[in-house]
Curated annotation (Swiss-Prot):
<dbReference type="GO" id="GO:0015934">
    <property type="term" value="C:large ribosomal subunit"/>
</dbReference>
<dbReference type="InterPro" id="IPR014722">
    <property type="entry name" value="Rib_uL2_dom2"/>
</dbReference>
<keyword id="KW-0699">rRNA-binding</keyword>
<comment type="function">
    <text>One of the primary rRNA binding proteins. Required for association of the 30S and 50S subunits to form the 70S ribosome, for tRNA binding and peptide bond formation. It has been suggested to have peptidyltransferase activity; this is somewhat controversial. Makes several contacts with the 16S rRNA in the 70S ribosome.</text>
</comment>
<comment type="subunit">
    <text>Part of the 50S ribosomal subunit. Forms a bridge to the 30S subunit in the 70S ribosome.</text>
</comment>
<dbReference type="InterPro" id="IPR012340">
    <property type="entry name" value="NA-bd_OB-fold"/>
</dbReference>
<keyword id="KW-0687">Ribonucleoprotein</keyword>
<dbReference type="GO" id="GO:0019843">
    <property type="term" value="F:rRNA binding"/>
</dbReference>
<dbReference type="InterPro" id="IPR008991">
    <property type="entry name" value="Translation_prot_SH3-like_sf"/>
</dbReference>
<dbReference type="GO" id="GO:0003735">
    <property type="term" value="F:structural constituent of ribosome"/>
</dbReference>
<dbReference type="InterPro" id="IPR022669">
    <property type="entry name" value="Ribosomal_uL2_C"/>
</dbReference>
<dbReference type="Pfam" id="PF00181">
    <property type="entry name" value="Ribosomal_L2"/>
</dbReference>
<keyword id="KW-0689">Ribosomal protein</keyword>
<feature type="region of interest" description="Disordered">
    <location>
        <begin position="221"/>
        <end position="275"/>
    </location>
</feature>
<dbReference type="GO" id="GO:0002181">
    <property type="term" value="P:cytoplasmic translation"/>
</dbReference>
<comment type="similarity">
    <text>Belongs to the universal ribosomal protein uL2 family.</text>
</comment>
<dbReference type="GO" id="GO:0016740">
    <property type="term" value="F:transferase activity"/>
</dbReference>
Length: 275
């Protein structure tokens, strides 16, 4: 995997940096694990905008990823590595000994032809999924479940991981890259290793149009609007003279947004607020 800086033949290519991986499969995705994906444009069923800055984008299809890794004690072979337009990480197509095919997240260091396995009896190696209680201190993990059987929800993006800090009765303490330290139930599954494609954050889009290909519309500053459109709008000069707020007047810096108090007991150290 290399970074390719484009020649400055046009103003946009002058700043474009691409991530090139020659090991990725260049054909179509596996048909039985692919389904259509409709565009919403950020609108709900009434046609009203519920999420701003969404619209356009290139057509894409959704790849069904196996986040649960619930096919235990059966060896699978990595057939190929693929690009996935729906996430920052790449994916791997694996074939089980009974013939079933599944997509999983590509772990860093996973190669074509490698064997992977899931279950409590699986060895601790790159790409294998086990209950988190089986991993020793200092282990690097990704695709970590919060509820057993629900599927991995933590550390799924490119280059992300969590580290096992200690074991505590029925829980395992892990540290996330954000700095958060939290408790995970010991029966939850996790995959050994970190997510691949860690160079993803080093690329440069080069032009605004590249963001439009991804379905991201422009974000207009509140100070550039009129008073009718935003609390920061209007006035002479650039200073809006008040605490930063959202377009609806809600405090936008420093306000806590987490509402699920029931699960706060599992967060030992918050990434923003010391506990």
């Amino acid at each position: 995997m290399t970074l390719n800086k484009c020649n400055p033949t046009t103003p946009s290519r002058r700043h474009t940096v691409k991530v090139v991986n020659n090991k990725l499969y260049k054909g179509k995705s596996f048909f039985k694990l692919t389904k259509s994906l409709n565009k919403s444009g950020g609108r709900n069923n009434q046609g009203r905008i519920t999420t701003r800055h969404i619209g356009g984008r290139h057509k894409r299809k959704y790849r069904l990823i196996d986040f649960k890794r619930n096919k235990d004690d059966i060896l699978a072979k990595v057939k190929r590595l693929e690009y996935d337009p729906n996430r920052s990480s790449n994916i791997a197509l694996i074939s089980y000994e009974d013939g079933e095919m599944r997509y999983i997240l590509e772990a860093k260091g996973l190669k074509i032809g490698d064997k992977v396995q899931s279950g409590i009896n699986a060895p601790i190696k790159i790409g294998n999924a086990l209950p988190i209680k089986m991993f020793p201190f200092g282990s690097i993990l990704h695709n970590i479940e919060i509820k057993p059987g629900k599927g991995g929800q933590i550390a799924r993006s490119a280059g992300s991981y969590a580290q096992v800090v200690t074991h505590e009765k029925n829980y395992v303490i892990v540290k996330l890259r954000s700095g958060e330290i939290r408790k995970i139930f010991s029966e939850c599954k996790a995959t050994f290793g970190e997510v691949g494609n860690s160079e993803y954050m080093l690329k440069s889009l080069g032009k605004a149009g590249a963001n439009r290909w991804r379905g991201i519309r422009p974000t207009v500053r509140g100070t550039a609007m009129n008073p009718i459109d935003h609390p920061h709008g209007g006035g002479e000069g650039k200073n809006f003279g008040k605490h930063p707020v959202s377009p609806w007047g809600v405090q936008s810096k420093g306000k806590k947004t987490r509402k699920n108090k029931r699960t706060e007991k599992y967060i030992l150290y918050n990434r923003k607020y010391k506990k």
